[in-house]
């Protein structure tokens, strides 16, 4: 599958081949769902904590005798039914992270790349460029040629270019990702995807294996 390649000024300068085994497969919505769920679960801190009846402050003495008062029987004022008592079945610190099978993860990446590549208006391949100044305004001028800033924008890099990443730090709703550090959730929810030529070539090699 071929796509147009644009200069950083927004002019068409050629074409590039997108490997069908990466950018044009049958989309697996199930794998995308599982990958997003996995990524979001791995981000959870899991520090929520409540006190049980054994941890709350207060005496464990029986408030009144079992029989003869006409009141309901109670064993301790730390009972979960009482105000100030412990919490029954409340959350405790836990680890929400889990591993996703490698094949499912790879299928999810290829599926989401195929989903995005199918929309030519919101998926652009751009020639490799540098932001030597590291200034936000220089990167913003390039992005405006391909995307509006009324939604999430993702830029895919072929390498870990720190100057481009530095320039994009102050741009709202912008994610700059290296080809080998992608997240399905970022690609799926991006309104516009801008891929540098080097990123496309690396993805062609990386996911065909």
From Swiss-Prot:
Pfam families: Ribosomal_L4
GO BP term, example: translation
Disulfide linkage: none
Domain of life: Bacteria
GO MF annotations, alphabetized: rRNA binding; structural constituent of ribosome
A GO CC term attached to the entry: ribosome
Tagged with keyword Cell division: no
InterPro entries (UniProt xref): Ribosomal_uL4, Ribosomal_uL4-like, Ribosomal_uL4_dom_sf
Keywords linked to the UniProt accession: Ribonucleoprotein, Ribosomal protein, RNA-binding, rRNA-binding
Annotated Basic residues bias: 59-71
Start and end residues of each stretch annotated as Disordered: 46-71
Quaternary data: Part of the 50S ribosomal subunit.
Similarity-based family: Belongs to the universal ribosomal protein uL4 family.
Record function comment: One of the primary rRNA binding proteins, this protein initially binds near the 5'-end of the 23S rRNA. It is important during the early stages of 50S assembly. It makes multiple contacts with different domains of the 23S rRNA in the assembled 50S subunit and ribosome.
Name of protein: Large ribosomal subunit protein uL4
Origin species: Borrelia garinii subsp. bavariensis (strain ATCC BAA-2496 / DSM 23469 / PBi)
């Amino acid at each position: 599958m071929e796509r147009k390649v644009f200069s950083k000024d927004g002019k068409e300068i050629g074409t590039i081949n997108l490997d069908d085994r990466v950018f044009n497969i049958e989309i697996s919505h199930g794998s995308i769902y599982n990958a997003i769920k996995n990524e979001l679960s791995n981000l959870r801190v899991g520090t929520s904590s409540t006190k049980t009846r054994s941890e709350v402050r207060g005496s464990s003495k029986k408030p009144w005798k079992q029989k003869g008062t006409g009141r309901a029987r109670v064993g301790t004022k730390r009972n979960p039914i009482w105000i100030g008592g412990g919490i029954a079945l409340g959350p405790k610190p836990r680890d929400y992270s889990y591993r996703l099978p490698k094949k499912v993860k790879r299928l999810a990446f290829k599926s989401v790349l195929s989903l995005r590549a199918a929309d030519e208006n919101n998926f652009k391949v751009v020639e490799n460029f540098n932001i030597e100044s590291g200034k936000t305004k220089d990167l913003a001028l390039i992005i405006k040629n391909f995307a509006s800033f009324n939604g999430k924008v993702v830029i895919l890099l072929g390498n870990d270019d720190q100057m481009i990443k530095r320039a994009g730090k102050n741009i709202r709703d912008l994610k700059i990702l290296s080809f080998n550090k992608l997240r399905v959730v970022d690609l799926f929810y991006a309104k516009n995807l801008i891929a540098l030529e080097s990123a496309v070539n690396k993805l062609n090699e990386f996911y065909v294996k």
